[in-house]
Regions:
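Ankyrin repeat A-helix N-terminal signature
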Residues: 34-39, 67-73, 100-106, 133-139, ...
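Intrinsically disordered, low-complexity regulatory segments in ankyrin-centric signaling systems
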Residues: 19-50, 59, 184-186
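Leucine-rich solenoid repeat scaffolds
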Residues: 153-185
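Ankyrin repeat structural motif
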Residues: 40-48, 73-81, 106-114, 139-147, ...
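Alpha-helical adaptor scaffolds
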Residues: 70, 91-111, 115-116
Length: 186
């Protein structure tokens, strides 16, 4: 009997084994966040369809929509929003995806966020709005697009600066002239 056990154990060890474990079976969280950070839409869709929370944050306390904004992926934003992601979710600094998007010249991303109801007047923990951020970064076309959403031009950050002050401190004369014209109308 002992020889039979040894034989069976030896046979088991010597025969090729075809057991496969997919990375997604062993480390689904890692696969999900890797897909989010690289914008792999099919993988993201699959995870969301299988119940993943579109607002779950990673170790950096960022929800997937922030990565979609950073990499400028409008389709990823649409996918997340179709799975009920929060358009005004905050990062640890109180920034929303719209405030983050104001740094980048991707008007399609901004349009999608606004279409899904992003709060144009949301202020982060420093009191900065998306318009203020766009002015600071000198993104004229982003500033124009955000102005079309009728932001409150009188809001101030917690340093007491409003959009007019920020535009005067900036180097972009087109932004400064545009903001001045709006203030003069009021």
């Amino acid at each position: 009997m002992k020889k039979a056990k040894i034989f069976l154990c030896s046979l088991f060890l010597l025969l090729p084994c075809s057991v496969k474990a997919l990375e997604s079976d062993v480390f689904p969280e890692l696969v999900y966040w890797s897909a989010v950070r690289s914008g792999e839409l099919n993988k993201i869709k699959s995870f969301l369809q299988n119940g993943y929370n579109p607002d779950k944050v990673d170790g950096s306390k960022l929800a997937p929509i922030f990565y979609a904004v950073k990499i400028g992926n409008p389709e990823m934003i649409r996918i997340l929003m179709s799975h009920k992601a929060k358009v005004d979710i905050e990062d640890p600094s109180g920034n929303t995806p719209l405030i983050l998007s104001a740094r980048f010249p991707n008007l399609e991303v901004i349009d999608i966020l606004l279409d899904f109801g992003a709060d144009i007047n949301h202020q982060n923990r420093e009191g900065t709005t998306a318009l203020m951020r766009a002015v600071e970064f000198g993104n004229f076309f982003v500033v124009r697009r955000l102005l079309d959403a009728n932001p409150d031009l009188l809001l101030q950050d917690f340093g007491g600066r409003d959009v007019m002050m920020l535009s005067a401190q900036g180097r972009n004369k087109k932004i400064q002239n545009t903001i001045e014209k709006l203030y003069n109308k009021k």
